[in-house]
Design a protein with these regions (language model features):
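Substrate-binding/catalytic lobe of Class I Rossmann-like enzymes that use SAM or dcSAM, i.e.
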Residues: 234-298
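Short, glycine-/aromatic-enriched active-site segment of Class I SAM-dependent methyltransferases
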Residues: 198-229, 234-239, 255-257
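A short glycine-rich, Lys/Arg-flanked "PGG" loop and its adjoining helix->strand segment in the class I
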Residues: 179-194
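Short catalytic micro-motifs in class I SAM-dependent methyltransferases
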Residues: 169-176, 198
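Short, flexible, mixed-charge acidic loops at enzyme active sites
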Residues: 59-66, 203-215, 264-267
Length: 353
């Protein structure tokens, strides 16, 4: 997939202007070379992959080996996230009880269901998920017995006004049309419902790739974890307000990671992974060899490896409740007020009034 060098005709998702121009060439394994475009309208500057990827592109990227440490792409060490999601669910369940004693909760982008499974065991809420990865949906159903719609949110056609709480953690940066996605989220939420949304700080996300483009012409920076949209605080708040949400709170989190990604300290900068152009094209040619929904036995084998990885990373300390509070305190110290943008991620709480 090769980006044209001129302006894109399709309008910017944030400001509505059509002047999106190529900014940084990046590599998306199994898809090819793509371009992060930038809106050149004054005071906008929104960055996004253009032309837009397709749903088949996303399905190829989020195949079963997206969660495999041996993969050239995807989320490395995902099994080790299991313990973090146990902690997150413990404190989220507490917040849910303070909000309402019970209700319906939807996680969009539920991955392998680590958070949903833990929430189901820590609260009286009814939980379900939406996940584009067929392996992710399969794993969640088989390991936790939960309802998961293997789809994008827009294609799931969920009932209007049906959820009391929505979680979108590390999700909005992956969707093809963020404004349309937020409108659909608003539609399925009941009046008074809330959403917890966490998405990367676009400047911190793009910064390492902007620096890497000055390297060898035979190498391309890899688009880590397949992010396709890059939001600043201003972009995010504008989209949320214009799609009907009331913002209740916003934090900038991940101070240390953000400083490294932004390159604030010259000798302490994060460097992105790079891939040779020939190796990138090899991943595209191998796209047809990915597992399909019919590969149930391969799914079982991959799931068993994931279970063993979780078990190997387990320890009594990580299951100890005082350790939960210690990690919670560390995260609080790694957060910034909403007016500051040095962190890696934005953490937003919104409500449908």
């Amino acid at each position: 997939m090769v980006q044209d060098t001129g302006m894109t005709a399709e309008a910017c998702d944030v400001c509505g202007d059509g002047s999106m121009v190529p900014h940084v060439e990046v590599a998306l394994p199994r898809v090819g070379s793509v371009w992060i475009n930038r809106c050149v309208r004054n005071a906008c500057g929104f960055r996004q992959i253009r032309p837009r990827l397709t749903v088949p592109d996303l399905s190829a990227f989020y195949s079963a080996d997206y969660f495999d440490d041996a993969s050239q792409a995807g989320f490395q060490g995902y099994a080790r996230q299991w313990h973090r999601y146990q902690r997150d669910a413990y404190f989220l369940a507490r917040d849910l009880r303070a909000f309402r004693s019970r209700g319906r909760l939807l996680e969009v982008g539920s991955a392998l269901g680590f958070l949903l499974g833990a929430l189901a065991g820590n609260s009286d809420w009814t939980v379900e998920g939406v996940e584009i990865s067929s392996f992710g949906a399969w794993y969640t159903r088989n390991r936790f017995g939960l309802t998961v719609h293997q789809s994008t949110l827009e294609a799931a056609h969920l009932q209007s006004n049906s959820f009391d709480f929505v979680i979108q953690k590390d999700l909005l940066e992956h969707v093809l049309e963020p404004r349309r996605h937020l409108e659909e989220t608003f539609r399925i939420m009941r009046p008074g419902a809330r959403m917890r949304l966490i998405t990367p700080n676009g400047d911190a996300d793009v910064g390492p790739m902007e620096r890497a483009r000055l390297g060898s012409p035979s190498e391309i920076p890899v688009l880590e974890q397949g992010h396709v949209s890059f939001f600043t605080r201003r972009h995010l708040l504008r989209l949320l307000n214009e799609t009907g949400f009331t913002v209740l709170g916003l934090r900038n989190i991940g101070l240390r990671r953000g400083i490294r990604a932004l390159g604030v300290v010259p000798f302490w900068q994060r460097r992105p992974a790079v891939i040779l152009r020939d190796d990138l094209m090899r991943t595209v040619r191998n796209r047809n060899e990915l597992m399909t929904d019919a590969d149930v036995e391969k799914y079982r084998q991959r799931a068993e490896r994931m279970d063993k990885e979780i078990e190997r990373s387990s320890s009594w300390l990580r299951r100890w409740k005082p350790y939960y509070y210690y990690r919670y305190l560390v995260k609080c110290c790694d957060a910034l007020p909403s007016s500051m943008t040095f962190g890696q991620d934005f953490d937003v709480l919104v409500q449908k009034v």
